[in-house]
Regions:
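Extended catalytic/binding region for NAD+/ADP-ribose chemistry, centered on the ART fold
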Residues: 72-77
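Long, compositionally biased stretches
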Residues: 2-70, 90-155
Length: 155
C-alpha cells in the first residue's frame, strides 16, 4: 500500500506562476464569486500546493499535479477556454487538479474530471469540466491500486 504522497518533481511549470496573482474570470464550479488566487507551495505539504483566494482569506483550494497520480493524464481543452485564458502554446499551461482533504489521509481524493488550467504567461486560469471521460471526480490519492477511484462518479 502506498502510505506516502507521490514524489514531487524537482521542477514544475507551476513554479512559473507561484506567488503571482492568478485571475479566474469565471471562478470555479460552485464557487464563482472568488476570482483572484495565488498559488503557494508550503514545504510541509509538498507535493500538494494551495490556491489561496485573495478575495476571501478563508478560502484555500488544495491542488496537485495530475501527472503524479496518472502519468498518462490527458485533456482536450476547448477553444473557448483557450481564448479565455489566452493560451496559445501548450507549454505555457499549468495543469492542476483539486483535492478533497479528509480527516483520514487515505481517503483524500483528486478531481480528475475538473482540472484547473493556468496560463503561466498571462496569469489567467479556468476550471474545465471534462465530458465523456473515464476519469473520476474521486480518484484516490493514496491507494493500494494507484489510478483507481470511485468510477461511478466519473462524468
Amino acid at each position: 500500500m502506498r502510505d506516502e504522497p507521490p514524489a514531487a518533481p524537482e521542477w514544475s511549470v507551476a513554479a512559473a506562476v507561484e506567488g503571482r496573482e492568478i485571475s479566474f474570470p469565471n471562478g470555479f464550479v460552485g464557487c464563482t464569486d472568488w476570482k483572484r488566487f495565488m498559488l503557494q507551495s508550503p514545504p510541509e505539504h509538498a507535493p500538494i500546493r494551495v490556491l489561496q483566494s485573495l478575495d476571501n482569506p478563508e478560502l484555500a483550494l488544495f491542488v496537485l499535479d495530475p501527472f503524479l497520480l496518472s502519468p498518462d493524464y490527458a485533456i482536450d481543452m476547448p477553444e473557448a477556454e483557450r481564448r479565455l485564458v489566452q493560451l496559445d502554446k501548450a507549454e505555457d499551461a499549468v495543469l492542476l487538479v483539486l483535492l478533497v482533504i479528509r480527516r483520514d489521509p487515505l481517503l483524500v481524493t483528486a478531481n480528475l474530471v475538473g482540472p484547473v488550467v493556468i496560463n503561466s504567461r498571462s496569469g489567467l486560469g479556468c476550471q474545465l469540466v471534462l465530458e465523456d471521460t473515464d476519469y473520476s471526480v474521486r480518484h484516490l490519492v493514496y491507494s493500494e491500486h494507484p489510478g483507481q477511484g470511485d468510477k461511478e462518479d466519473a462524468a
